[in-house]
From Swiss-Prot:
Keyword Acetylation set for record: yes
The encoding gene: yceH
Keywords in alphabetical order: Acetylation
Organism encoding this protein: Shigella boydii serotype 18 (strain CDC 3083-94 / BS512)
Name of the protein in its database record: UPF0502 protein YceH
Residues modified as N6-acetyllysine: 80
Length: 215
């Protein structure tokens, strides 16, 4: 497979794909915007604390590999970045909105079950039911230009198998280390995380509104 992203490159591309859909008014992103998105505490696994120089290095590498491009509009002195990873004018990788949502969520959080993916990808694409999630995953696993995802062996005590993207190479199919989060139902945890994301994004808007009313 021609895609071989490092963990940091996958995080950067995942962030740009996410923000392109969820906050189009702020897209393309500046370096600071990418840093904030990469270090976001919600909908990220693992949570990172990348410096601006670390992010800039990843951006430069991805531009050289033609996965990103710089944008500098008239009167705009700040360089911004947009993704060319998929659905770009001259790119080979074409994905549906449902496929973009699933791949983005896998890039940002690693291996997940279909139920977790449906909840966590909801802000990018609203799946009608679990059957649509599973059929989209199967399409990604069986594409002629892929595969782009793989189904992992079901972990002991789990009802669903997890899926992982293949943009960083082959995946070692090993059970995850047991931790406290395994005691929580995956679907419920994903719903709570989705709500936390919405609250985190609504708070700045509320603060701005309150400040405006106070003037």
């Amino acid at each position: 497979m021609k895609y071989q992203l490092t963990a940091l490159e996958a995080r950067v591309i995942g962030c740009l794909l996410e923000k392109q859909v969820t906050t189009p008014e702020q897209y393309p992103l500046s370096v600071n915007g990418v840093v904030t998105a990469c270090n976001q505490k919600t909908n990220r696994e693992p949570v990172m604390n990348l410096s601006e120089s670390e992010v800039q290095e990843q951006l430069d590498n991805l531009v050289k590999r033609h996965y990103l491009r710089t944008v500098s509009g008239f009167g705009n002195r700040v360089t911004k970045y947009e993704q060319r990873f998929c659905n770009s004018e001259f790119g080979d990788l074409k994905l549906s909105a449902a496929e973009v949502a699933l791949i983005t969520t896998l890039l940002l959080r690693g291996a997940q079950t279909p139920g977790e993916l449906r909840s966590r990808a909801a802000r990018m694409y609203e799946f009608s039911d679990m059957a649509e999630v599973e059929s989209t995953l199967e399409q990604l696993a069986n594409r002629e230009d892929g595969p782009f995802v793989v189904r992992l062996a079901r972990e002991p005590g789990k009802r669903e198998s997890r899926y992982m993207h293949l943009f960083s190479g082959e995946v070692e199919d090993q059970p995850a280390v047991t931790d406290m989060s395994n005691a929580v139902d995956g679907d419920l945890q994903a719903r709570v995380e989705a709500l936390e994301i919405e609250v985190a994004e609504l708070k700045p808007r509320l603060d701005s509104l309150l400040a405006h009313l106070g003037d």
